[in-house]
Amino acid sequence: MMLRLTSVSCFLLVIACLNLFQVVLTRRCFPPGTFCSRYLPCCSGRCCSGWCTRRCSPRYGKRATFQE
């Protein structure tokens, strides 16, 4: 009986530790110059085009090109 109780306690302790590690790892943030997304936030600055930067630079698209 004691062996069964110990193994169940050990199993529950492992599950609790894994849940704790998951919370710690999912709440981390990334420094400038690394990849970011909606679910992987930047520590400081903003996520611009998938990269952590201090400020977003203006985007130049087809409307910003010079046409003759």
From Swiss-Prot:
The record's section on PROSITE patterns has:
I_CONOTOXIN (PS60019)
* Residues annotated with Tyrosine amide modification: 60
**One cellular-component annotation, GO:** extracellular region
Coiled-coil residue windows:
none
- Propiece residues: 64-68
Expression tissues: Expressed by the venom duct.
Pfam families in alphabetical order: Conotoxin_I2
Domain characteristics, as noted in the entry: The cysteine framework is XI (C-C-CC-CC-C-C).
Can you say what this protein is called?
Conotoxin Mi11.1
